[in-house]
Amino acid sequence: MISKINGKLFADMIIQGAQNLSNNADLVDSLNVYPVPDGDTGTNMNLTMTSGREEVENNLSKNIGELGKTFSKGLLMGARGNSGVILSQLFRGFCKNIESESEINSKLLAESFQAGVETAYKAVMKPVEGTILTVAKDAAQAAIEKANNTEDCIELMEYIIVKANESLENTPNLLAVLKEVGVVDSGGKGLLCVYEGFLKALKGEKVEAKVAKLDKDEFVHDEHDFHGVINTEDIIYGYCTEMMVRFGKNKKAFDEQEFRQDMSQFGDSLLVINDEEIVKVHVHTEYPGKVFNYGQQYGELIKLKVENMREQHREVIRKEQHTAKPKMETVETAIITISMGEGISEIFKSMGATHIISGGQTMNPSTEDIVKVIEQSKCKRAIILPNNKNILMASEQAASIVDAEAVVIPTKSIPQGISALFQYDVDATLEENKAQMADSVNNVKSGSLTYAVRDTKIDGVEIKKDAFMGLIEDKIVSSQSDQLTTVTELLNEMLADDSEILTVIIGQDAEQAVTDNMINWIEEQYPDVEVEVHEGGQPIYQYFFSVE
């Protein structure tokens, strides 16, 4: 029985919850409704939870209130994607409820889950049932009921998991698209994974990391970033040190947590990856020999590498002395756009964007990524263009915590971002620009072409794995094995008699022959439509389209 949870135990709950989510991230990704190759829910929740875990591991406290503040900060700044932001808000409310406590009982644990739900619902502009919010709400309500007749936090957590699982299984009955595709909600599944890890910790058990076979021929390719290091002497740990150790039968038994703790004493930038046979280590240290000696306790050293980072920094300085380096741009009003592909970034820059953050479907920038750009620009005002529905909440979260006056234009696609930026008026106020830029989003129809990562049926369209898919906004309107056929079906849905301009943004995987045939087809079928073609260089999507 566990009647009280202190900071030490809560830290272990967080660590085991994060590990269980990490182990199941691919499974959560596979539950995404749309078969586009982004797999964002599991990935984003995992990265968000990992950020919280790392903050906790670096700032351990026996006081649960203090630890909760640390955890909440890590989640807030590391939140990626809408699922990650919602996860961060669930635990923001949870941790706020325990901030004055040194330890909590089952009743306060239940109340904190409920406080998290209330915070998360307030953070979402239009809450949708049948999602992670529903699973969290049902689990919290069950916790409140159960806490009335048990003081055992283990028993409470077991009941929470039972009810969360029941809620998860019911999500297809609340959200029609889940039922059509035949899956449960991916975010709800991710949350359940975290709760299951919590229970493991309460029982004194450990979630083992998934074992993956390691490539014994490859080291970590560490490109050292010296931004912010002015003098070579400022580098505290001067040697980038890497080793591979093959475990020996008569050597010390390998325990990853103990290994990490011991290795962390030698320096920073620690990375440890292991399987049943070997462990790979990367660390920045002053004493490479001590690292190697420590590794020999566990087995045979099979590969070693040491690089002198101070010498590398001296070389960087020598090169920079011969190359004019532009200063980081500071502006009164920062226009920050999220972009994918060099060509698209150049389009945004040419239209007046002051700062570009690389990101998109496969890698949503975190709240912290956006905050850093705003802070480094030293701007008084900031306009953020997410250009992706899954980056919208992280953008809003960033805007809410910076000192600058910041607004988010709700652009959900690259074409919408371009249209909004076209409306920016340097002489207008921030609120005037926000209004006219947001209004322009409604005047553009966005489309895209990509491929399917699995078989499914959605929006009444049969989709086969690896087939091409044409989407208008988020709706799949065409899917064929032939790329040109899919494109023409998509454009027939997008174009109308009153369409004036069609913009085509070409991705890095587009084939020139398909592009040429597509342009010829457009000119034949829609001779009155003006066609603008740009090289975008975006991954995942062969084409982006916009119609005005």
Curated annotation (Swiss-Prot):
GO terms for biological process: glycerol metabolic process. SUPFAM superfamilies: DhaL-like. Residues 8-200 form the DhaL domain. It comes from the Bacteria. It holds the Pfam family Dak2. One of its GO terms (molecular function) is glycerone kinase activity. PROSITE patterns: DHAL (PS51480). NCBIfam families: FakA_VfrB, YloV. This is Uncharacterized protein SAR1202. The lineage of its organism: Bacteria, Bacillati, Bacillota, Bacilli, Bacillales.
